[in-house]
Amino acid sequence: GGLIIKNSSDITNIHDLKNKKVGIAGGSIDKSWLFFRAFFKKKYGMEATAFFRTSFAAPPLINGLLKTGDLDAGINYWNYNARLESQGFKSILNIEDMLPILGITGDLPLIGYVFKEELLEREYDLVKRFLQATNLSRKILEESDEEWDRIMKLTGARDKEMLITIRESFRKGIPKSEIEILNQNIIKAYDILKDIGGKKLVGEGEHLAEGTIWNAN
């Protein structure tokens, strides 16, 4: 995800957002927004909420308000930004741009699967095969343009141009770092999000609980 504006906007950088209306997808503890707040605090030494006017809404509504001009900018999820980028919008700051400033180098997985440990005891091979299948599916989507054409309706793309922006955004977001780097970055990301989101986000957890990350052998 990231910060998106109209191509015709007079906003060219973060400083131009002062007192502007910025829509945030999700709620106040959405991870993209928390990363943005952490980045803003680290780079500019201030709280983003005191710099521009924020409002929270569902991703489709953020896109709609951007199109009507009721918002000056939006922080939305990658797939919604990709749709806008084929309709006269552009991203000026993405999550991957913020992470190095926050001390995270290499890729950071932002989506994963959650399951109970007891499932591993009962169906270890099934879980392992499921993850293998998702990896193979991702590989197909990374390499095959024809597969994207086949699933176009599933993506919500209205035309070929929108499909291409969704496809390329998806491919750009596939983590390619070694598993050890990914695991380290997940732990670092937890600490960053905890410091900004506080107990409302993580409860009493000071650090990512041991065993949270599971890698199939």
Regions found by a protein language model. Give the residues of each.
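Bilobed "Venus flytrap"/periplasmic-binding protein-like clamshell domains
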Residues: 2-86, 149, 183, 187
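Short coil/loop linkers at secondary-structure junctions
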Residues: 12, 46-50, 90, 157-158, ...
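Flexible glycine/proline-enriched surface loops and loop-helix/loop-strand junctions
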Residues: 18-22, 112, 170-176
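Pocket-lining segment of extracytoplasmic ligand-binding domains
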Residues: 60-152
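Short secondary-structure capping/turn micro-motifs that flank functional sites
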Residues: 82-83, 100-101, 158, 168, ...
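Secondary-structure end/capping motifs
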Residues: 121-199
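Conserved C-terminal helix/tail region of periplasmic/extracytoplasmic solute-binding proteins
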Residues: 187-217
